[in-house]
Amino acid sequence: MVIIMTKGTKVFRIIISVLLALTMLCSAFFAVVFCLYFAKDPYGIYVAGIAVNRDNNEDILGDGTVYYNENNNILTLNNATIEYEDTVVYSKIDLHIQLIGENKLVCTNEDYGIGIYAGDYNLNKDLAIMGDGSLTIEIPNANGEAAGLSAPNLIVAADLTVITPDCEKMTNGIVCDSSLMVVNEATVTVNNGAATKYSSAVRVRGNAFFEEGTTLKAFTNPGTTGICKGLTVSGDLFMGKDTTLEVSIDDGTTDQGECIRVSGLMEIGIGSTVTASAKNASAIECFGAVEANKSATLSANSDNNDADIFCSGAVVNHGAEINAEIDAIGGVNNRD
């Protein structure tokens, strides 16, 4: 016997009803899963491994020192001391961190340690550190690899200190895949460990800008046998008025040192101070031009290199005091 189903048959209506019911059940199931997932992790921010969500955002750690405001996208550290075995603060989204009082982040991992990481795969994310307080990031125990802070685009508007250990492979203080801005008279201090392969205190793969009155102090420990870097800027380096840049590397055990390396223009603002020192490498290497403005002071010293400053372009002096031996392919131009 052959049953022919048409839109008017009872069997057809039953089958359609069953299919509609199954569709509704599947939709409800996925809706519940979706809601539960995003209720658990709606923001993409983790503090000491805890996903920040609407249930805990007002007191993430339970001690009143860390809280998040969804409306203005600000994660506040209020006299917080956080120790964690993995990445201490991880954000998949653009994030502002506000500092109140003295704050410290410590990653205790003995293999790979990182203090703050902002980013999601290949998507650039912005991280801003601000407020009237201060932040210290320490990676005391890692012996494989370490990174104090990594963010594609970083703005520092509060005092920041990063301390990384000696590592077998590599150690990085601050890594910016796109840009670095230091503003609001902030002081950034990086004490970077030594490594057998790669040691870099501050690495910026784009432009770096230091606003008026800001300070960067970057140092590396002795003992690196691979690449040893202080401040590396793959784009342009701009220093505003009355800024301070103090960079020193101990590259005595390697011939792959770069104390200050700028791929583009290096502009030193009026009244600013630059101090750079290395053992084997040139203290400053610039592959664009160096422009030192009125009343600035530029001091560079390399113990074992004939040139304290190497420049592929010209070194243009607009009334600054320069204390260094200079090798400039484009010459040294004094324009008082």
Segment roles from a protein language model:
Residues 1-4:
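Short, Lys/Arg-enriched N-terminal segments with co-localized hydrophobic residues
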Residues 6-23:
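N-terminal Sec-pathway targeting helices
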Residues 14, 30-336:
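A composition-driven surface/loop motif
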Residues 20-24, 28-32:
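Hydrophobic helical h-region of N-terminal Sec-dependent signal peptides
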